[in-house]
């Protein structure tokens, strides 16, 4: 598939604010089912031997791919002294897990993947031996995966999550983060090590898309706060990770991320959808009028039946364009509403509480 078409699909989904789903419906043919007794830890001598061989080959693959992607790794020193941990990264290439493996070196690493990557063939067997952990549906399957993650981090391993969800090829901007990685870190009392890929253009390819040099930025570990609950730590580490992603983007590209205007796309064909997105881009951005009068709500008449309002869908961080306040303990810039000694959750985002930490 041409990369130009992938970029068009990314622009279409960005305009629809559909940040966490695949660009195309994944194939579910020839998959190995993820059952409640799925062997994530690969018990047995034969499985252990196969895992050792494939993990070594996986590390070698990262070394081979690094010059192809012209990979540069920044912040590798932040991994020193870190035991078992959750690693987060933006998902921008089918091979980015090998590049992350290149960064962590000989440290053993598990990789969480969607169930549609659990192929029932030789390729799937190699991936499983290399450390992939497919996510299954249902409470029993999720508990089994949770137990495997706990065993992995307790054994000193890294577990790689892609909290942005689906793969978007070379997508530069930070996307909304899902909770799973941060809940796992909070529940198991281990740090999150945030990573973020940025790109530098060079040359052009045949379909008009410029080639990319990859840089993998490794942030400082974000440790759970023992004074907070699992839920509060989930929110806290999630927002600090987004803070790192945003600050890394701004430092790499020299400006804040600008997202396409939101449009409601109702077209049936890909060409019509792309045209709708392009037309929305040509429209000037609307600036809200702060002095405009707010509409007054009509009071219901006596005995009038009112239709209940629909429940709003879960909201993601609002990605504010400004209001960057420091989080000096972690060395990152955090998007907040006002300066505080520690950090503040984004107003209108996934949480609305403030935590003050001593510096």
Language model segments and positions:
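Helix-to-loop junction immediately C-terminal to a conserved catalytic motif
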Residues: 61-91
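Short, basic, glycine/proline-bearing loop/turn elements
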Residues: 60-61, 129-136, 164-167
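Non-catalytic C-terminal accessory region of glycerolipid acyltransferases
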Residues: 2-32, 146-359
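A conditional alpha-helix N-cap/helix-loop micro-motif detector
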Residues: 138-142, 174-175
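A generic structural signal for well-ordered alpha-helical segments
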Residues: 64-66, 104, 127, 152, ...
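A short, surface-exposed helix-loop junction/capping segment
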Residues: 34-45
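Short hydrophobic helices that act as membrane-entry/anchoring signals
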Residues: 47, 51-69, 124, 128
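Catalytic core of membrane glycerolipid acyltransferases/transacylases, capturing the structured
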Residues: 81-139
């Amino acid at each position: 598939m041409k990369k130009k078409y992938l970029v068009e699909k990314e622009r279409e989904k960005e305009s629809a604010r559909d940040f966490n789903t695949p660009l195309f419906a994944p194939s579910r043919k020839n998959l190995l089912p993820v059952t409640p007794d799925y062997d994530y830890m690969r018990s047995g001598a034969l499985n252990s031997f196969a895992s050792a061989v494939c993990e070594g080959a996986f590390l070698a693959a990262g070394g081979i791919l690094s010059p192809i992607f012209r990979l540069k790794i920044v912040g590798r020193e932040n991994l020193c002294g870190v035991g078992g941990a959750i690693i987060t990264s933006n998902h921008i290439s089918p091979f980015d897990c090998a590049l992350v493996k290149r960064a962590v070196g000989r440290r053993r690493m598990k990789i969480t993947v969607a169930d549609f990557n659990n192929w029932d063939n030789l390729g799937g067997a190699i991936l499983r031996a290399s450390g992939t952990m497919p996510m299954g549906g249902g409470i029993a399957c999720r508990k089994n995966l949770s137990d495997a993650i706990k065993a992995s981090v307790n054994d000193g391993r890294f577990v790689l999550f892609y909290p942005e969800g689906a793969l978007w090829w070379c997508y530069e901007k930070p996307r909304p983060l899902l909770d799973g990685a941060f809940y796992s870190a909070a529940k198991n009392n281990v740090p999150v090590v945030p990573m973020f890929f940025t790109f530098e253009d060079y040359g052009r390819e045949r379909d008009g898309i410029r080639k990319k040099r990859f840089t993998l930025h490794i942030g400082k570990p974000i440790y759970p706060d023992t004074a907070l609950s699992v839920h509060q730590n989930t929110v806290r580490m999630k927002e600090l990770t987004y803070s790192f992603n945003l600050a890394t983007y701004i430092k790499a590209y020299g400006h804040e991320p600008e997202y396409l205007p939101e449009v409601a796309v109702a077209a049936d064909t890909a060409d019509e959808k792309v045209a709708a997105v392009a037309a929305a881009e040509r429209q000037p951005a609307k600036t809200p009028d702060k002095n405009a009068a707010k509409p007054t709500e009509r009071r219901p008449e006596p005995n009038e039946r009112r239709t209940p309002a629909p429940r709003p869908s879960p909201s993601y961080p609002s990605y504010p364009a400004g209001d960057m306040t420091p989080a000096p303990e972690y060395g990152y810039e955090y998007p907040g509403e006002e300066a505080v000694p520690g950090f503040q959750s984004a107003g209108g985002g996934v949480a609305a509480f403030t935590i003050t930490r001593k510096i």
